[in-house]
Amino acid sequence: MKTNNDCSNDPVLQALQAASDPIRLNILTCLVFNSEKRITSETYNIVKSTLSHHIKMLKDAQLIQEIKIGKTKKYILNQEYIERELPGLLELIRFRAKDQEN
């Protein structure tokens, strides 16, 4: 039985749920303005396991992709997917970031 909280089969709901957390939204905002970025737990003042959870949520929602360079992991936005499945989301994130600057 599917419940209202079951987002696993709906990619739009899964992406919106992933983006709704303040830390994950900040990660997305950072990636909107940086083509690729190494994301560390120190940046967000959280433990590594919590950061791993946030990264997994964003990857599972197909909002970000991981690039491995040696032992280093960097992340990029999955822009093609976002523009196709969630048109307007990148513009909302950009608007939010610019609004917070002012």
Where are these regions (language model features)?
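Conserved segment of winged-helix/HTH DNA-binding domains
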Residues: 3, 8, 12, 16, ...
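A cross-family signal for key residues in well-ordered alpha-helices
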Residues: 17, 26-29, 59, 65, ...
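Short capping segments at the starts of secondary-structure elements
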Residues: 22-25, 32-38
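A short acidic, leucine-rich amphipathic alpha-helix
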Residues: 40-44
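Helix-turn-helix DNA-binding motif, specifically the short coil turn and the N-cap/start of the second
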Residues: 47
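Short, hydrophobic-biased segments on the C-terminal half of alpha helices
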Residues: 55-56
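Beta-hairpin "wing" of winged helix-turn-helix
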Residues: 59-70, 76
